[in-house]
Amino acid sequence: MAKPEQEFHQPAAPWTAVGGLVRGIWTRTLADDPATGAYTGLLRYEPGVDTSPTGMRAHDYWEEVYLLEGDLTDPRLGEMFTAGMYACRPPGMEHGPWRTERVVVMLEIRYKATG
């Protein structure tokens, strides 16, 4: 099965709280394929989120992120990432933790490495 074909529409999927140590992070699935792990969705961080308790993250999939609204601060790097910025992370690339002062919304695309 592949991601479903979808023409422009208002997504019906609800915002769902991401479980774990950090509260205030929400996800909204736009399209996914459980068989391949391909996923497109939105991530929303509420003001005051700090993911430092979970430390740096790395995944076993490619992750592309486009910052639509707000800004993220990476305290480890001492950098702020703002709306309009983009990241493309290969499997295993460490990133985070993040801090927010206001609402952050990101488009996230994930897919497994092939080859």
Predicted segments with their positions:
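Short, charged/polar surface micro-motifs in flexible loops or helix N-caps
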Residues: A35-G37, E46-T51, D71, M93, ...
